[in-house]
């Protein structure tokens, strides 16, 4: 028999509300609607299927405050992560939302009605407090960046009534709800289940540690990877799932099953580990593997970890009695070539030879085509990863040129386009500032917000082209650091390559050589909000290359960029 759900009752709202489906669907058509974002869809799916039990909706202010402050809901149940529905004031005003209102929650992908929410309250969160209490307060933390830059200013709390499941078109048979997974465990006769959370491909070491955990507890293994929102730059879930499927036959027959979790991760370290344990308990697991730096976002710009390596393990251990799921501490294993086996590092005698391959080295081997030994990963897994990891020489990239108007960006961009076309091997796209303004952003002005929007449109196009293998040369002014960083994230989040080139031609030179007289007009006040005159240009702090047309020729600058790309492996060296 599987583990009881968190809070004692599985809140399967889809099953609960199924008898009222037609009635709710009809009502939903008459109500104002909130179109959910991708992260909100992930959250709603796990609310409706019971993955977030005991939640029955998005948190009201009382629950939200308690979770932030005390790691538990207002009713006393342990819960570590705020699950909130953020909306703008414009949405609230347009739909005249208030406490007691009912509102339809709609899927942005297909416009389907998913649920009706009855509003308990509408409140403005203290984002700084949430950031500090939940994630630690470091402004470089991706969850805090998301909170400050993307999350809207108001939260709406209230219970939901489920109408429709989210439509998925990939790996449908592996997307078990908690109720379905519990039935599956019962059918298999499993009573002890070790759940393994991952957002990365699995290799021999992962197989070894999960088998060891199961063997020590006379249990079976649930491989439960996240296929919702993970960390930008992660390998896409399509590739990962194919790799998990290839790995599964390497387990003893009947030991392991694969199920997919459509979770939007926050990379919240200790808080997230508790949350993950609750989710796995709701899916019927009795044990949960918590690794070193579990759900941590990596390092900040200073090279420092956001959390201690064992903070997550300590957090889950602190609440193990309330959680009702046994914590299995992730043991780092290493390969012993002399005996052809994996062992936990703390069990390896001094002087015994060991071998390891870091994540960075693995990515480099995939990128360059270097061999990956069978002691590290299985050939069938490596084959799948290689199919999805094109060599650098065939990958796309974005060269993002930023600088004052008339700094030479456009001349460099055009010359670079010709050079890359001559090089061959990939299509080349040019996104000049004036062209994009005319074709994509003609309705935008030059306020800070409009400039940011314009740069994000450029980044979206650049990201799509880059992921398709093209060379993209973008040359907006892009005066703000925030906008440039967001552009970088937009290109790299799907695995794209991004290079920031600061065309640092001095303002005086740009003005002196301005044959169109635009700077003169700005100085006379005929043009407002002009970068370098009455609007600032924020010097990039993270440029890959800094060039200056007042001291260099366009030809030499293009050569510098080509050399940078060659050094990074973007041209075939065969």
Curated annotation (Swiss-Prot):
Q: What is its EC number?
A: 2.7.7.4
Annotated segments matching region Allosteric regulation domain: 395-574
Protein keywords: Allosteric enzyme, Amino-acid biosynthesis, ATP-binding, Cysteine biosynthesis, Cytoplasm, Methionine biosynthesis, Nucleotide-binding, Nucleotidyltransferase, Transferase
What regulation of activity is recorded for this protein? Allosterically inhibited by 3'-phosphoadenosine 5'-phosphosulfate (PAPS).
Q: Where is this region: N-terminal?
A: 1-169
Residues bound to 3'-phosphoadenylyl sulfate are 434-437, 451, 477-478, 516
Positions bearing the site annotation: Induces change in substrate recognition on ATP binding = 330
Q: Which cysteines are joined by disulfide bonds?
A: none
Location in or out of the cell: Cytoplasm
Which residues does the record give as sulfate binding sites?
Answer: 197, 199, 295
Q: Which InterPro entries match?
A: APS_kinase, ATP-Sase_PUA-like_dom, P-loop_NTPase, PUA-like_sf, Rossmann-like_a/b/a_fold, Sulf_adenylyltr_euk, Sulf_AdTrans/APS_kinase, Sulfurylase_cat_dom
- What metabolic or biological pathway is this protein involved in? Sulfur metabolism; hydrogen sulfide biosynthesis; sulfite from sulfate: step 1/3
Entry's Gene Ontology cellular component terms: cytoplasm
Q: Which GO terms describe its molecular function?
A: adenylylsulfate kinase activity; ATP binding; sulfate adenylyltransferase (ATP) activity
Q: State where ATP binds.
A: 197-200, 291-294, 333
GO process annotations (BP)? cysteine biosynthetic process; hydrogen sulfide biosynthetic process; methionine biosynthetic process; sulfate assimilation via adenylyl sulfate reduction; sulfate assimilation, phosphoadenylyl sulfate reduction by phosphoadenylyl-sulfate reductase (thioredoxin)
Site, Transition state stabilizer: residue positions: 203, 206
- HAMAP family, sorted: Sulf_adenylyltr_euk
Q: How does it assemble?
A: Homohexamer. Dimer of trimers.
Q: What is the protein name stated in its UniProt record?
A: Sulfate adenylyltransferase
Native source organism of the sequence: Aspergillus clavatus (strain ATCC 1007 / CBS 513.65 / DSM 816 / NCTC 3887 / NRRL 1 / QM 1276 / 107)
The encoding gene is: met3
